[in-house]
UniProtKB/Swiss-Prot annotation:
<feature type="region of interest" description="Disordered">
    <location>
        <begin position="372"/>
        <end position="397"/>
    </location>
</feature>
<feature type="compositionally biased region" description="Basic and acidic residues">
    <location>
        <begin position="117"/>
        <end position="129"/>
    </location>
</feature>
<feature type="compositionally biased region" description="Polar residues">
    <location>
        <begin position="324"/>
        <end position="351"/>
    </location>
</feature>
<feature type="compositionally biased region" description="Polar residues">
    <location>
        <begin position="8"/>
        <end position="17"/>
    </location>
</feature>
<feature type="region of interest" description="Disordered">
    <location>
        <begin position="1"/>
        <end position="24"/>
    </location>
</feature>
<protein>
    <recommendedName>
        <fullName>Calcineurin-interacting protein 2</fullName>
    </recommendedName>
</protein>
<comment type="subunit">
    <text>Interacts with tax-6.</text>
</comment>
<feature type="compositionally biased region" description="Polar residues">
    <location>
        <begin position="189"/>
        <end position="208"/>
    </location>
</feature>
<feature type="compositionally biased region" description="Basic and acidic residues">
    <location>
        <begin position="526"/>
        <end position="538"/>
    </location>
</feature>
<feature type="compositionally biased region" description="Polar residues">
    <location>
        <begin position="607"/>
        <end position="619"/>
    </location>
</feature>
<feature type="compositionally biased region" description="Basic and acidic residues">
    <location>
        <begin position="546"/>
        <end position="557"/>
    </location>
</feature>
<feature type="compositionally biased region" description="Low complexity">
    <location>
        <begin position="688"/>
        <end position="705"/>
    </location>
</feature>
<feature type="compositionally biased region" description="Polar residues">
    <location>
        <begin position="151"/>
        <end position="163"/>
    </location>
</feature>
<feature type="region of interest" description="Disordered">
    <location>
        <begin position="426"/>
        <end position="708"/>
    </location>
</feature>
<feature type="compositionally biased region" description="Low complexity">
    <location>
        <begin position="312"/>
        <end position="323"/>
    </location>
</feature>
<feature type="region of interest" description="Disordered">
    <location>
        <begin position="115"/>
        <end position="169"/>
    </location>
</feature>
<feature type="region of interest" description="Disordered">
    <location>
        <begin position="181"/>
        <end position="232"/>
    </location>
</feature>
Amino acid sequence: MNRGYDSYNRSRSTSSRPLDREPYHAVSELYTKEITHTPIGPASDLPPEILDILKENPRATPQYTPPLIRHRENTWTPENYPIVRVPSAQFTDVMTELYDYHEVEKYTHRSVTPDYEPLRKEPELKEQKLPTYQVIPPTPEKNTPRHQHHSGITLSPSDSSRTLGALPKKPPMYEEYLQMQKKDENRNIPRQVSSADSQRTIRNNNELSHLRHIDSSSSSEASEPAKDLDDRERYVYTHDVYVDSTTGRPFTPGREDVREKKNCDKLKINVYFKPPHPPVEITYKLDEIEIEKNENIVVTKLRPSRSDTILSRSVSTSPSSVTDNIPKTSTSRIPSSENPKTMEHTTTSRRFPTQTSILRKEHEIVQVPLHRSQSLRQSRISEHSKRSLGKTTSTVSTERPIPIHVVEETSSIDMDVVFPKMPHHQTVTNVRVPSSRGSAISRAHSEHRRSIDRSEPRHHHRHHVHSETPELPYTRGISKTPSVREYNVKREGQRSPSRSHRSERSPSEVRIPVTTTHTRPIAKRQSPEELDYGRFADKSQQNRFPGDHQAREEDLPYTRGISKTPSNQDSRSERTPCSDIHIPYNNPEKERAYQQSERSSYRSHKSVTPSEKSLPRNSETPELHYTRGISKTPSDRVEKSRYLSRGVSTPHTPSEVHIPYNNPEKERAYQQSHRPSSPKRRPSGRTNSPNKSSSSSKARPSAAPLEEIVHIKERYERDETIRRFFPTTTAV
């Protein structure tokens, strides 16, 4: 992802040209951040509600939100690559560690409301002369209560020898930032390396690696042996954060709009991932057994408000985690299922999540109900059941038959048992029929069934329901928009054989009702021509299946686009002009007839004067003289030559007609028909052979030939007649 940018920055920061850097270019430093990152699986596996939660910007009350952090989101890219954003280049020299994890929690409302204590204790702080840098201990181990070490490990040169227990209680990190901001005004200026500073960098290189692994209940020296043990188990992403040094806001390098940014500082962050402490499945899989246990929980309790606190699943396993009083909102909490007794405590108190990390939001995946079906019964989030989960809920709920390959009956699933009949807006759009687990055969045929289904009349199903071997099409999935037939057909009265055996099965084996509707067996896939024009209506081919006694061609009225080769009825309607009726535009078939009769949309009926009607016509349908886009006043020469070519001696004065405004062509004609000076122009049809049309208008292009041709083309696309294929020889 960052490869291009690495090289770009490397070439930029070479020492060969130190002076032509941008004025704001700060010294890039190396920050280390520990994140216990539990992958949340590909984005598609989560229902949209949860994706929304993952995307949402955490809200916090403004007075407790550090101003630097407010706009930053920590996110995952779709590939589960974490984007850890660091506030800006202005603070690069100050930041040893940006986050106090507690601060992050307050900031996202995951944890306690911020404590007011430190604010009152502030005067004590003035005693310390040296600025204190905090390295926040990384995500503590499971059994450690979070509350003891609010302020992390103090790393001021004087304090570095202290063990954790001796720490004074200090304000959370962001308040210290605000103080530091006030203290040194020019934060951009890199500091001269003093002895303390060099000490600090050494400490950052050495000791920080230990600090990463501190189990915060132990003292800092105890953690050193733990380092080698952990190091092989975890992986590091070196993460480049690019900061726009003018605005001070971080940005994601991959985006196109940012590609040319010149004034960007690169901060290097090492993000350490430990494989999550409870193995991943435990953290985010919903397994069936647990869900059965929780089934009695009321649905309304499963819908936490977004801003509510989210308990991590592993809370109940750490007995030492400390309870704390909280506002009533978080009563709507699911007790974690390992320890049902937490139910009582949840109402009065809540436990701290013991594994806190910036990026980890997957508690929400555990606790927020997936709204797909509102009950908690759900099969494991795994590809198979997810597939059937998406497909079947709505299938069952709309009472549509689910054809399934009967032979694989053992693995079939009765979704009516697993899910209540509740359609969900998300799944109704994706109706797909779940295939039973192993059927690879079924994949090939879904296309056929899709094209067949749509064209099938509704009553067709009743014919062979009782035949001994029902022909069920193999289906991988119906087209995403369920066809009309599926919505309309009600399931037949008989129960499918698999339903009757339900008592013999343990409820964990889920089964699908096989509905024996007789579906038309798969013929050869119809070619687009067959679908479109009904061209090869070969009855012997269509009806060679027993029980299929209806002619199929009537069911294929598809005209998918404009049919290029017109069908019979097209040419028929073309030959009979209904010259006396005005048919409104919005009805396309009638519209076609109308356009043939009144070729010009300029002339409305009432404007045809008797003298005009008596004019000899070369054919029934005079061709429109296309001037849609021409300048409103055509030159006189063009007009005269037109009239000469038609042999019309005296231009007649048109009667006045009001033509509604919203049809621009007619409107223009209306304006022209009111100019007494200009004679009414009659279109010369194609029927006057081209050499009759005036030589003058042919010799030089008229007002706007190109534009006109474009409009001719538009006009032709609107009516679907053979004329489309003639070269456009209209006299222009």
